[in-house]
Amino acid sequence: DMTTSSPILAGEIEKEAMIKGLYALDAPVSGGDIGAREARLSIMVGGEKEAVAQAMPIFKVMGKQISHMGKAGMGQYTKMSNQIAIASNMMGVCEALWYAERSGLDVKSVLEAISAGAAGSASLANLGPRILRKDYAPGFYIKHFIKDMKIALDSAEEMKIDLPGLKLSLKLYEELAEKGHENEGTQGLIQWYYEQV
């Protein structure tokens, strides 16, 4: 199962599969539309080691980084960790570019300068230029990101941990979706900042 879903559901699917003498793997991916087209996805796999080994030739056709994370559900927990990092990172990217614009800096020059330093990230490198062009075409839809953030918050609640950064990111994305931006890419978050003026 290469969708992004609940880690608990992944465990339930594996139990049902094993009753029938089958294996089930949860193998969500990261890398967006570009990673998928170029077979450079990061694939995070949960499930039995033997099943992962059997599926490895298929995974290698789609991805560059294939990581067996442990038992069923661990692929999904890893994907949630990925989404949590992206949520806060995307807020940081948007706030940095918005701050630069409002201060009168040449935002393209700022993007080049900070991409080469400690602030550099895949979000900044891939989505920063799209933000500057006001290109909100989806590599990953806001509506799907909202779903993922809710799954992460549900699992965090089960673990009895608080993720205030993720809660804030979800709030901003939900506000954007309510204004009709749910079918845009996650870089569309910058519009939340534009609308504050």
Residues covered by each model-derived region:
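Rossmann-fold dinucleotide-binding core
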Residues: 4-83, 87
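Helical "substrate-binding/catalytic lid" subdomain
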Residues: 74-197
